[in-house]
């Protein structure tokens, strides 16, 4: 264990706070902070566009970013099944280190446990994050009718990527996960405008479930337009073949942003300047009709309600 800590963890997450190896990380702050935690049990461990290591960093960082916080520190805890190949573990650690370094965050504390075979499935990871809040309070209570809804990129990529890899589906094409940390996309926009009311990342349950949560928490209705929702042809085809609506498939590198109507096009233009925001779209608006519900204007010219996810067709996608 000590050799693993010295040769892998301390070496690859190299920073003076972690090197102290104290029971807690000693941090000095006088500013407003955001603090979050998340656990990751994705199966398979690797998928097109990422792995459990990258996901464990991006997922927690994105939760901080959605609150208007610049991520700074992470904790890392790993529960490893006895018999996991060392090369697999090393690859995951390398992925964590690389993703954290690119994001400019430090892993300053952590834990490592080995459990008997069968007590977990290969490896489970928990990360917690601390970030410095740079905006006013982002809240669903800020939302008013006429506010616009933006999604920052093509939806459903992660959910379908993981499912296809897990089931070894021969779809005739690959679907790459959108797994990415969003600080380089979102933070510059937050620094240039105060017109953002609220943000969420549409992970479990996808865009549909996240929009329903926003509608319920704001006490208002949301109407979206099917023709405006950015969806790749591969995800559309996979959804039709598997009977899964892409609106319910998880994203791990997208944000849903509620903005003032008059600033929506300006914010959209800012997002599109970054590679992760190239396919950003205004997909709908907040209304006073059907409070707490989400309605979609379909490409057939009809309307229907979009409900919360009631069962999970894509378990263990994060």
Where are these predicted regions, by residue range?
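Beta-strand->loop->alpha-helix junctions that form or flank phosphate-binding loops
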Residues: 16-20, 202-203, 221-230, 248-250, ...
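Helix N-cap motif at beta-to-alpha junctions
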Residues: 259-265
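Active-site-proximal betaalpha loop/short-helix elements
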Residues: 81-83, 175-251
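Acidic, Ser/Thr/Pro-rich beta/coil linker or hinge segments at domain junctions
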Residues: 2, 9, 274-318
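A generic local secondary-structure boundary/capping motif
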Residues: 14-16, 23-25, 65, 97, ...
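Glycine-rich anion-binding loops of enzyme active sites
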Residues: 29, 33, 40-42, 70-162, ...
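Extreme N-terminal cap/leader segments of soluble proteins
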Residues: 1-49, 67, 76, 95-108, ...
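Small-aliphatic-rich amphipathic alpha-helix that forms the alpha element of a beta-alpha
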Residues: 48-74, 94-102, 184-191, 209-212
């Amino acid at each position: 264990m000590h050799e693993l800590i010295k040769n892998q963890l301390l070496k690859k997450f190299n920073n003076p706070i972690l090197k102290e190896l104290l029971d807690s990380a000693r941090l000095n702050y006088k500013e407003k902070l955001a603090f979050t935690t998340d656990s990751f049990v994705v199966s398979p461990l690797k998928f097109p566009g990422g792995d459990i290591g990258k996901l464990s960093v991006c997922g927690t960082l994105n939760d901080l970013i959605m609150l208007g916080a610049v991520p700074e520190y992470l904790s890392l805890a790993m529960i490893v099944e006895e018999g996991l190949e060392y090369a697999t573990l090393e690859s995951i650690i390398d992925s964590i280190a690389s993703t954290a370094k690119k994001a400019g965050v430090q892993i300053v504390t952590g834990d490592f446990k080995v459990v008997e075979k069968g007590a977990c499935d290969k490896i489970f990871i928990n990360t917690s994050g601390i970030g410095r809040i740079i905006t006013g309070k982002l809240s669903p209570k800020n939302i008013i009718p006429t506010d616009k809804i933006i999604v920052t990129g093509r939806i459903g990529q992660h959910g379908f990527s993981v499912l296809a890899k897990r089931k070894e589906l021969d779809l005739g094409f690959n679907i790459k996960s959108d797994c990415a940390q969003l600080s380089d996309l979102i933070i510059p926009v937050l620094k240039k405008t105060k017109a953002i009311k609220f943000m969420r990342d549409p992970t479990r349950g996808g865009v549909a479930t996240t929009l329903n949560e926003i509608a319920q928490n704001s006490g208002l209705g949301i109407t979206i337009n099917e023709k405006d929702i950015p969806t790749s042809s591969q995800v559309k085809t996979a959804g039709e073949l598997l009977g899964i609506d892409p609106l319910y498939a998880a994203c791990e590198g997208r944000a849903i942003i509620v903005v003032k109507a008059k600033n929506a096009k300006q914010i959209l233009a800012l997002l599109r300047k970054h590679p992760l925001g190239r396919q950003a779209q205004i997909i709908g608006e907040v209304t006073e009709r059907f409070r707490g519900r989400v309605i979609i204007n379909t490409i057939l010219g009809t309307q229907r309600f979009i409900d919360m996810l009631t069962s999970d067709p894509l378990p263990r996608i994060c």
